[in-house]
C-alpha cells in the first residue's frame, strides 16, 4: 500500500499529511500529524434518501485511550459513551464547516476525526478542524473552503501559536480561530479578564496564521492534481417565491412592524398568514403552477415563506434601523434578577431574566472528593468547577421526550463554565468543589449568556468569594452586500434569521469567554472588532442590573452546606495520616464524623457539618504529623497495657511506649503497679529508633497529673500560597 506524503512547515513545526492510503472507501481521507499527535480524518458523502429542509451534516470526533497508552477503566475495559471533551471537539469541527457548505445541499455528509496518538505538546482539536477541511476537499465535495483553525495563547505580553497543554494552563488566553478565504467563520475562547483590544489583536494574529494553512491546502490540491469543486447555486424556480412576495409581503411587513407585540403574538400572526396563503393555493386550479409545486413538496411553502420573512426582517433592520421588538440596534432587553429565591437547602440560587429568556441557576458546595474524575485524553485529571445546562422542551412551548443532555446542552454548559472559571477563588482560600446547574425556564435567545449571569448570582448567593461578577450578551449581525448592522442582545428570531451569533462574556475589567458562529462564509477582523467593542457597554449595563440583586458574596454559607478546613502537611507524612490499609484516617473520620481528603501535595481538606468536629480532626492530624524530638516532655494518657510496658498517647493519634524498666527508678514487677489504662502521666521522649518508634520514660520526670496535651506545632512546610 502506498499513499502520498506532504509536509507543511508551520510556525517552525512540521505538519505531515498522508493521503490515498487510509480509509479508501471514504470520499476523502487524510492522516494529519504533528509531533506525536496523529489523527485520521475522513469525509463521506452519500445521497439523501428523503427530502429535507436542512443540511444533514454529522461531525464526530472520537478518541481512544490507546492514543495515550492507557486502558479504559470500568468492567468492560472499553470506551463507552463519548466523553464531554469529545463532544466539544465534535462541535468545534461542525461549527466552522457547516456555513461553508451550500445552503441547498441535501446530501448526507459525515466527517469523522479519530485521534490515534496524542502528544501533550500538540493538542488534537485544531488539527482535527483543519483535517476536516482537507478530507472534504480530497473527497471532491462542494465546499466554500479551504478552511483551517489555529489556537492562540498569551503568556506575558507574547502571543503563542498552537501552545501546548501546559502553556495553555499558564497563559491568560486560550482562543481557537477558524477561517476561510472570505474571513473568520468561528471563534471559541476563554480568557483571564483580557481587554477588548488584546482580544482583537489575538484574533487578528490567529487569522494571519489561518491564511497560511489555507494556502498550504490549495498547494496540496495542485500537487495531487485535484480540482476543488466550488458550489454553484442551482437555478431557483421563482414561481412560488414570486407568488408569496406578491400575496404576503405587505401582511408580513405589518406584523414585523408591530413593535409592541409579544413573541407569541408575532409567531401566531405569521403562522396565520402562512396558513391562509396555503388555503388560497389549495383553492387554485389543479393545473396552476403554484399549486402543482406545493402539492409535490409540502415543505416548499414553509421554506419559501421563511425566506421571505427573513428578507423583510433584514430589510427593516438595514433600512430603518429598527428591530422586530422596536429596540434600537444597540439596546438591551429589559432585565430582572433576584438571588436567594430557593430555600437554603439549596446552597445558592438565582433567577435571571432578559426579555423572554429566563434562567434559574443553583449552586451546590461539595467536598474535594466530589470532584469529577476525567477519564479521557485531557491531561487534567479532575474538574472542581462544574456547570450543567438544561434546556427542557417547555422553555420554547414544545412537547418532546426528556432525554440525556445533547451536544447543544453540553456546549452551552461548557461555554458558561469557561466564562466563570477565571474569577473563581483559589482552592487554598475556598476549597469547595462547585456545581452550578442552569435550568432554562424560557428561551428567546442567548440562554447561554443568561446562564453566565445566573451562575454569577447563584455563586454569590452561596457565599463564593468571586474575584468579580461575570455577565454576558449575544451580538448579532445582518449583512447585505456592503451594508452591515451589528445587533446587541439578539433574540430568537434575530439569531434564526441573522448571519452571526457572537457571545461575549466578561467582567467590568475584561473578557472571560467568547463564542462566535457564522451562517455566512466569513467576516473580516474589522467587523468582528466592532462587535467586540459594542458588546462592552451592553455587558457593563447587565452587570449593573445584576449587582442590584446581589453585589457581594453572602457572609455566611447555607447551614446545610459542608464546613471545610484546609491546611498543609509535609507530603512525606501523608502515609502516616492514612495508616496501614487506611486504618488511621478511617479511625479519625469515624471518631470525629468528618470527611477527609488529602492531595498528593500535602493539602488536607476536612469536611463536616460541625465546625468543632472538623477542628478536632485537624488537631489529630497535626498531632500525627508533628515531629517529636528526643528530650521533649509531654503530658499524655495511657492507652494500653502490655506485659513489658505501657503505651501513652502523647499527641492526638500519636503514641509512644514506656518500657517496664522506664516506669520508675525502682524495680517494677508488674506494669499495673505503677500505671493503669486511662491514667494521665508526664513522659519524656527517651529516643526515636530507626523505624520511627517513640520510646518514652517516666524516670526523672516529675508527674503533674491533669496536665493537658501541649499545643501541637505542625511540621514546617511551604505555605499554601
Curated annotation (Swiss-Prot):
In short, the EC number is 2.7.7.8
Q: Cite the S1 motif domain residue spans from the record.
A: 631-699
Q: Name one GO cellular component term.
A: cytosol
Required co-factor(s) are: Mg(2+)
Could you cite one Gene Ontology molecular function of this protein?
A: RNA binding
What class does this enzyme belong to in the EC scheme? transferase
Compositionally biased residues, Pro residues = 711-721
Entries under SUPFAM superfamilies matching the protein = Eukaryotic type KH-domain (KH-domain type I), Nucleic acid-binding proteins, Ribonuclease PH domain 2-like, Ribosomal protein S5 domain 2-like
Say what the protein does.
Involved in mRNA degradation. Catalyzes the phosphorolysis of single-stranded polyribonucleotides processively in the 3'- to 5'-direction.
Give the UniProt family note.
Belongs to the polyribonucleotide nucleotidyltransferase family.
Name the record gives this protein: Polyribonucleotide nucleotidyltransferase
What taxonomic classification does the UniProt entry list for its organism? Bacteria, Bacillati, Cyanobacteriota, Cyanophyceae, Synechococcales
Q: Which gene encodes it?
A: pnp
Amino acid at each position: 500500500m502506498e499513499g502520498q506524503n506532504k509536509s507543511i512547515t508551520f510556525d517552525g513545526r512540521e505538519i505531515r499529511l498522508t493521503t490515498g492510503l487510509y480509509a479508501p472507501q471514504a470520499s476523502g481521507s487524510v492522516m494529519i500529524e504533528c509531533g506525536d499527535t496523529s489523527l485520521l480524518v475522513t469525509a463521506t458523502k452519500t445521497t439523501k434518501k428523503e427530502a429535507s429542509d436542512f443540511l444533514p451534516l454529522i461531525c464526530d470526533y472520537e478518541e481512544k485511550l490507546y492514543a495515550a497508552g492507557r486502558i479504559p477503566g470500568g468492567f468492560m475495559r472499553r470506551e463507552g459513551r463519548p466523553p464531554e471533551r469529545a463532544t466539544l471537539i465534535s462541535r468545534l469541527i461542525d461549527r466552522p464547516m457547516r456555513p461553508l457548505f451550500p445552503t441547498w445541499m441535501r446530501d448526507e455528509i459525515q466527517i469523522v476525526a479519530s485521534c490515534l496518538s496524542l502528544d501533550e505538546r500538540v493538542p488534537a482539536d485544531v488539527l482535527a478542524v483543519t483535517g476536516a477541511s482537507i478530507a472534504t476537499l480530497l473527497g471532491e465535495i462542494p465546499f466554500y473552503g479551504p478552511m483551517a483553525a489555529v489556537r492562540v495563547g498569551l503568556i506575558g505580553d507574547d502571543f503563542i501559536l498552537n501552545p501546548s497543554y501546559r502553556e495553555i494552563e499558564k497563559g491568560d488566553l486560550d482562543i481557537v480561530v477558524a477561517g476561510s478565504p472570505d474571513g473568520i467563520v468561528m471563534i471559541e475562547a476563554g480568557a483571564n479578564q483580557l481587554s477588548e483590544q488584546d482580544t482583537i489583536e489575538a484574533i487578528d494574529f490567529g487569522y494571519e496564521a489561518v491564511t497560511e494553512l489555507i494556502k498550504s491546502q490549495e498547494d496540496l490540491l495542485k500537487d495531487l492534481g485535484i480540482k476543488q469543486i466550488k458550489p454553484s447555486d442551482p437555478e431557483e424556480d421563482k414561481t412560488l417565491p414570486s407568488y408569496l412576495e406578491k400575496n404576503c409581503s405587505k401582511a408580513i411587513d405589518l406584523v414585523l412592524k408591530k413593535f409592541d407585540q409579544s413573541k407569541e403574538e408575532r409567531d401566531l400572526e405569521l403562522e396565520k398568514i402562512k396558513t391562509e396563503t396555503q388555503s388560497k393555493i389549495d383553492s387554485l386550479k389543479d393545473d396552476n403552477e403554484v399549486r402543482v409545486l406545493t402539492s409535490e413538496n409540502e415543505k416548499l411553502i414553509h421554506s419559501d415563506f421563511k425566506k421571505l420573512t427573513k428578507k423583510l426582517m433584514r430589510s427593516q433592520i438595514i433600512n430603518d434601523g429598527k428591530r422586530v421588538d422596536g429596540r434600537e440596534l444597540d439596546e438591551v432587553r429589559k432585565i430582572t434578577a433576584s438571588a436567594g429565591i430557593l430555600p437554603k437547602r439549596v446552597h445558592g440560587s438565582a433567577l435571571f431574566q432578559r426579555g423572554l429568556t429566563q434562567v434559574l441557576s443553583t449552586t451546590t458546595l461539595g467536598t474535594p472528593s466530589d470532584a469529577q474524575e476525567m477519564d479521557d485524553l485531557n491531561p487534567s485529571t479532575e474538574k472542581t468547577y462544574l456547570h450543567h445546562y438544561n434546556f427542557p422542551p417547555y422553555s420554547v412551548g414544545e412537547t418532546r421526550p426528556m432525554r440525556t443532555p445533547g451536544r447543544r446542552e453540553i456546549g452551552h454548559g461548557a461555554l458558561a463554565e469557561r466564562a466563570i472559571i477565571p474569577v473563581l477563588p483559589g482552592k487554598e482560600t475556598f476549597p469547595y468543589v462547585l456545581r452550578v446547574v442552569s435550568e432554562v425556564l424560557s428561551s428567546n435567545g442567548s440562554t447561554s449568556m443568561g446562564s453566565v449571569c445566573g451562575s454569577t448570582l447563584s455563586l454569590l448567593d452561596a457565599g463564593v468569594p468571586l474575584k468579580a461578577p461575570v455577565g454576558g450578551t449575544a451580538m448579532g449581525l445582518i449583512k447585505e452586500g456592503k451594508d452591515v448592522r451589528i445587533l446587541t442582545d439578539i433574540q430568537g428570531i434575530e439569531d434564526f434569521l441573522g448571519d452571526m451569533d457572537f457571545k461575549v462574556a466578561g467582567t467590568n475589567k475584561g473578557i472571560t469567554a467568547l463564542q462566535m458562529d457564522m451562517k455566512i462564509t466569513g467576516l473580516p477582523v474589522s467587523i468582528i472588532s466592532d462587535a467586540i467593542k459594542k458588546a462592552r457597554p451592553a455587558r457593563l449595563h447587565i452587570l449593573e442590573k445584576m449587582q442590584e440583586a446581589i453585589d457581594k458574596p453572602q457572609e455566611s454559607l447555607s447551614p446545610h452546606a459542608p464546613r471545610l478546613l484546609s491546611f498543609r502537611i509535609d507530603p512525606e507524612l501523608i502515609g502516616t495520616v492514612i495508616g496501614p490499609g487506611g486504618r488511621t484516617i478511617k479511625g479519625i473520620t469515624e471518631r470525629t464524623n468528618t470527611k477527609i481528603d488529602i492531595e498528593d501535595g500535602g493539602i488536607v481538606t476536612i469536611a463536616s457539618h460541625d465546625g468543632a468536629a472538623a477542628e478536632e480532626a485537624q488537631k489529630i492530624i497535626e498531632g500525627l504529623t508533628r515531629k517529636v524530638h528526643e528530650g521533649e516532655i509531654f503530658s499524655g494518657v495511657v492507652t494500653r497495657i502490655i506485659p513489658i510496658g505501657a503505651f501513652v498517647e502523647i499527641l492526638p493519634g500519636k503514641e509512644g511506649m514506656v518500657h517496664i524498666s522506664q516506669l520508675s527508678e525502682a524495680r517494677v514487677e508488674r506494669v499495673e503497679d505503677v500505671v493503669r489504662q486511662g491514667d494521665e502521666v508526664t513522659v519524656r521522649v527517651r529516643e526515636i529508633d530507626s523505624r520511627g518508634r517513640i520510646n518514652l520514660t517516666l524516670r526523672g520526670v516529675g508527674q503533674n497529673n491533669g496536665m493537658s496535651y501541649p499545643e501541637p506545632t505542625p511540621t514546617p512546610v511551604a505555605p499554601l500560597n
